[in-house]
Swiss-Prot record:
Homodimer. Its cofactor is Zn(2+). It comes from Methanococcoides burtonii (strain DSM 6242 / NBRC 107633 / OCM 468 / ACE-M). Gene3D superfamilies: HUPs, Isoleucyl-tRNA Synthetase, Domain 1, Methionyl-tRNA synthetase, Zn-domain, Nucleic acid-binding proteins. It is an enzyme of class 6 (ligase). It is found in: Cytoplasm. This is Methionine--tRNA ligase. Keywords: Aminoacyl-tRNA synthetase, ATP-binding, Cytoplasm, Ligase, Metal-binding, Nucleotide-binding, Protein biosynthesis, RNA-binding, tRNA-binding, Zinc. Residues 582-684 form the tRNA-binding domain. One of its GO terms (cellular component) is cytosol. It catalyses: tRNA(Met) + L-methionine + ATP = L-methionyl-tRNA(Met) + AMP + diphosphate.
């Protein structure tokens, strides 16, 4: 049964862009799908509001302002305007876009933190804080760097961003150093305030079991909550930020006031539209967060616990995207692994809708996306130009030349059935946050239209029976109308143009999906159509690849010095042929990793608990330690050989095998399903 439209109003939010640098393609992996989802809900008749805002507090902005000899206020003014403009250029149409430094957010944050204090969920504690004797200052968050205590990779003060991804509390970082002078730091004692996150374990376990959205968010969070939950330091020694109640020398941690921004932006929207923000955050509205996969911990653990403690509604769904990479390196604007939205894309003349389609259709939303200009070119040329654009142009041009209008004729029931089936399948995909499946489903209707046009050969029929030919092109016009409505969430500007080309006078953005089967009107004048999608030439792709390669090379040189190119690993010799009977003896299934820990006696082995749809999880030992951090594996779905005889490795029993390949550097590469599925699903 379809979830939308529902009587409950829906609030869609996005993880806040940090107002400390420009927008890159990695940002858009969150914002474009959220916009697609919102547009789609509107097309079902659902009441939906879409809000976001700039994250304007925290140490990176202060750090940047000091380097540029300006103020945090000036920094955020520049980048808030930048993101607002980029979103509009990319068709991300927000109902409100505020900042966390708005008075509304200051007031709402103070109210919520005060309520947590009043309810007994906040307490003071003396802890060790990094301090630089050379600069004579405390070093919160990005002011300090060092070694992650968990994975031993270089990390920032509040997170291991290039290693295991763990949130780090003050004082945890090993071998601390000041990021301002690069000198060694030391730890000093200071009083800060903590949120009693540990008291919310039972609540979080129950809450997460019922959390909607994508499985990677729920499973990752559950894996953490099932372990020991530690209380959370929610203050920092900074001047910039929202003051902690009663303490002018402290501000609340940015991960407290940033998500509270969702409430503040809803308030700002409500005030501007004479609406109620409480219908989402206090009453029975539904809240859906779209975020990047790197901030699941904050949105699925800290945030719902804070909301519960302060008496607010918790999110109904969290939709977490896979990270975007370039040449297998995670996007990072500070490190230089990026493709900028303006100078690398829009300024080169690429249309906004092409990138929207690429991001939606390339791979499952929860999987990592390794950005490729070549794949981008192939998606545009093969699908948008070769399939969809080809059907639109040949249909409309033929109709214009031979009829000048939509001719008389009956729209066949099988055409209407195909459209209805496509609508239902597309809506189901969208409700499950499967944007690739949605795009593929709609593109299949374009392929159906091409086949229908080609098989009926109207260019021949026009010479023999113009009336019969007219009926064929009218059916094609009906398919075109449906495609415009179904592709509008992904290709809003192009579909606005196509909508006009088929003679429609209504607003395609405000037209319900179900109007796709309302018959096109015979006699509607059709002007000569324009070509909606142009091929991307190889020379342009090569130019863009060269720009990206140069930037990555520069980033590597800056970060690690000169790096030799790895030799290509020789392909292993193929094994002897086996019979199908031999293969059928293998029971290979999809499993979800629910916990992972190192085996101390081994340099290569990890002990995993894997959900295979059985009553209990399966313990499996896997040689993944050198290539994967245990925390990064939690929530991942993998291929498992389940009927391998039990064996003991380093004294630990293993009841199966996780299947993986090996790259040129002998790192394990996990085999994962195209989209998330039920644990225990058989691989045939």
């Amino acid at each position: 049964m379809s979830k939308f439209p529902s009587e409950k109003p829906v609030l869609v939010t996005c993880g806040l862009p940090y107002a400390n640098g420009k927008a890159h393609v990695g940002h858009l992996r969150t914002y474009v799908p959220a916009d697609i989802f919102t547009r789609s809900l509107k097309k079902t008749g659902q009441e939906v509001t879409f809000v976001c805002g700039s994250d304007t507090h925290g140490t990176p902005i202060v750090f940047n302002a000091e380097e540029l000899k300006t103020t945090p206020t000036e920094i955020i003014k520049v980048y808030h305007k930048h993101f607002d403009e980029i979103f509009k250029k990319m068709g991300v149409m927000l109902d409100a876009f505020g900042t966390t430094d708005d008075p509304t957010n200051h007031n709402r944050t103070t109210e919520i933190v005060s309520k947590l204090i009043e309810n007994g969920y906040v307490y003071p504690k003396t802890i060790e804080i990094a301090y630089c004797p050379s600069c004579d200052r405390s070093l919160p968050d990005r002011y300090v760097k060092g070694t992650c205590p968990h994975c031993k990779k270089e990390a920032r003060g509040d997170e291991c961003d290039q290693g295991c991804g763990k949130h780090l509390e003050p004082g945890e970082l090993e071998h601390p150093a000041c990021t301002t002078c690069n000198g060694p730091a030391e730890y000093k004692q200071q009083e800060h305030f903590f949120f009693k996150l540990s008291q919310f374990k039972d609540f979080l376990l129950e809450y997460l079991e019922g959390l909607g959205g994508t499985l990677n968010a729920r499973n990752y969070a559950l894996g953490w909550v099932k372990q020991e939950l530690t209380d959370w330091c929610i203050t920092r020694s900074l001047d910039w930020g929202i003051k902690f109640p009663g303490h002018e020398d402290l501000v609340v941690y940015v991960w407290v006031d940033a998500p509270i921004g969702y409430i503040a932006f809803t308030e700002e929207w409500a005030e501007a539209n004479n609406e109620s923000w409480e219908k989402f955050w206090k009453d029975d509205g539904s809240i859906i967060h779209f975020i990047g996969g790197d901030i699941i911990y904050h949105h699925c653990i800290f945030w719902p616990a804070m909301l519960k403690g302060a008496g607010y509604n918790q999110p109904d769904a969290v939709v977490a995207s896979g990270m975007v990479k370039i040449e297998d390196r995670t996007f990072s604007k500070s490190r230089g692994y990026v493709v900028w939205v303006d100078e690398d894309y829009l300024d080169h003349g690429f249309h906004q809708d092409l990138l929207r389609y690429y991001l939606a259709s390339y791979t499952s939303h929860t999987k990592e996306l390794n950005f490729s200009w070549k794949v981008f070119q192939d998606k545009v040329n093969t699908e948008l130009v070769g399939v969809f654009g080809n059907f639109l142009y040949r249909t409309l041009l033929f109709t214009h030349k031979n009829f000048g209008e939509i001719p008389e004729g009956e729209v066949k029931q099988d055409i209407l059935d195909e459209i209805n089936t496509t609508i239902e399948n597309a809506k189901e995909a969208m409700e499950n946050y499967e944007f690739k499946k949605y795009a593929d489903t709609v593109m299949a209707l374009a392929s159906y239209g091409n086949t229908y046009f080609q098989s009926n050969e109207p260019w021949k029929l026009i010479k023999e029976n113009k009336e019969a030919c007219g009926e064929i092109v009218k059916n094609c016009a009906q398919i075109t109308k449906a495609l415009c409505l179904l592709f509008e969430p992904i290709l809003p500007e192009k579909m606005e143009e196509a909508w006009k080309q088929i003679g429609m006078e209504t607003d395609v953005h405000e037209t319900n999906y179900m109007e796709a089967t309302e018959l096109v009107k015979s006699g509607t004048t059709l002007e000569k159509p324009s070509i909606l999608f142009e091929k991307i030439e190889d020379e342009k792709t090569e130019e863009m690849e060269a720009i990206s390669a140069a930037r990555v090379k520069e980033a590597i040189a800056k970060e690690n010095g000169t790096e030799e190119v790895e030799e290509v690993k020789e392909i292993e010799e193929m094994k002897d042929l086996i019979t199908f009977d031999d293969f059928s003896k293998l029971d290979i299934r999809i499993g979800t990793i629910v916990s992972a820990e190192a085996i101390k006696k081994s340099k290569k082995l990890l002990k995993l608990q894997v959900d295979l749809g059985e009553e209990e999880t399966r313990q499996i030992v896997a040689g993944l330690k050198e290539s994967h951090e245990p925390e990064q594996l939690i929530g991942k779905q993998v291929a498992v050989l389940t009927n391998l005889a039990p064996a003991k490795l380093c004294g630990v029993e293993s009841n199966g095998m996780v299947l993986a390949g090996v790259d040129a550097a002998d790192n394990a590469i996990l085999l994962q399903p195209e989209k998330e599925t039920n644990p225990g699903t058989c691989i045939h």
